[in-house]
Amino acid sequence: METFNFSVPQDITVEKGSLSKLPEIAKKLGGKHALIISGPHLEKMGLVKKAADYLASVDIKADTFTDIEANPSVTTVEKATAKYLESGADFIVAFGGGSPMDVAKAVGVVAKYGGSVTDYEGAHKVPGPIVPLIAIPTTAGTGSEVTAFSVITDHSRNYKLTVFSYEILPKYAILDAELITTAPASVAAACGIDAFIHAEEAYVSTAASPFSDALAEKAMALIGKNIRRFVANRNDIEAAEAMMTGSLFAGIAFSFARLGNVHAMSHPVSAFFDVPHGVANAVLLPVIAEYNALADHGKYLTIYNDISPIPAYADEFEPMMLVDAIRELCADIGIPENLTIAINNASRTGTVTKEEIESKIEPMAVDAMKSGNIAVNPRASRQCDIEMLYRRAL
């Protein structure tokens, strides 16, 4: 049997209504003053105040920082770190989707060790434990509550940098499915397909193991069978619970098996054009699934049966059937048809022409090749291959 190592050094609560357990968990952490890092949407909905009130019920003070954008920047990390230091907080509550989670992890590093988040770019540059962190996701999702990554946009380089260190794993995670029912359909779709892609890329990764495969398979089954239902009705608590659990399993799976070309290529798209992360992944997925089909050794059939309403048997299955099923799923949940549409949907300055996009393909490919995920993609890729895949996605 193949040998492998794994460790999941976190305390994870998965329970409907478990936001109410925040005071108990904060007490376990020994915290007396929290900085809640969240987004403006949750603040407007009163959920940030609800979390702060829970903490106040056990005499834990809470300050808040909610000025967080999609694809959060180095500047946002600097502002949030300043807020943490000025407030006198001694732990962080990351409350929201992937953006608040990424910022909270980065703040936990910089507040403890100083400098800029850029000083910790790359693998294993965080010298030790960070500020204690409780993660409460409100999307399903990034899986950030169980991953050792923080992704931050450096606008000076049009580049999404990654901090990778097991030191930045949250000590505690609270997964309350009631929280994800507040997401708009577009957010539920983008986050849900992102979670599915985490599992899919981990599953076909050359670094996959029996452990990561088991988690990825369960994640794909949960998400694939529920994502249409959840996007159509976010108040469907059964579907919400399945999506949240699937996202959790996918996050753990890719923490061990890494990802692939989809994530390597989507980060530059978000850095150059501010396309939401999940949307960028989704429009690239069918193109890259087709490219990787030559390297399939039977796993595509499993993936297909997780997302297709009509199952297939091995003797009738062709890998291109999965590509078609992915396109059908993305259309059903409202994902843009191609990269050109996705970029224009995200544009704040008017129409972005195909020529303008094509002018960025080479620098995007250069940045994509810097990602460690390229190395574990099931089919080897050169820069010219990445450029070709971007063009196919247009």
Model-derived features with residue positions:
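Short glycine/serine/threonine-rich phosphate/pyrophosphate-binding segments
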Residues: L19-L22, K44-L47, V74-T75, S99-A104, ...
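Glycine-rich phosphate/diphosphate-binding loops that line cofactor/substrate pockets in enzymes
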Residues: S20-L35, Y54-V58, E86
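C-terminal charged capping/lid subdomain of soluble metabolic enzymes
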Residues: S308-L394
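N-terminal small/polar loop signature for handling phosphorylated ligands or for N-terminal nucleophile
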Residues: E43-G115, R229-A240
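Active-site segments that bind and position negatively charged phosphate/pyrophosphate groups
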Residues: A202-E328
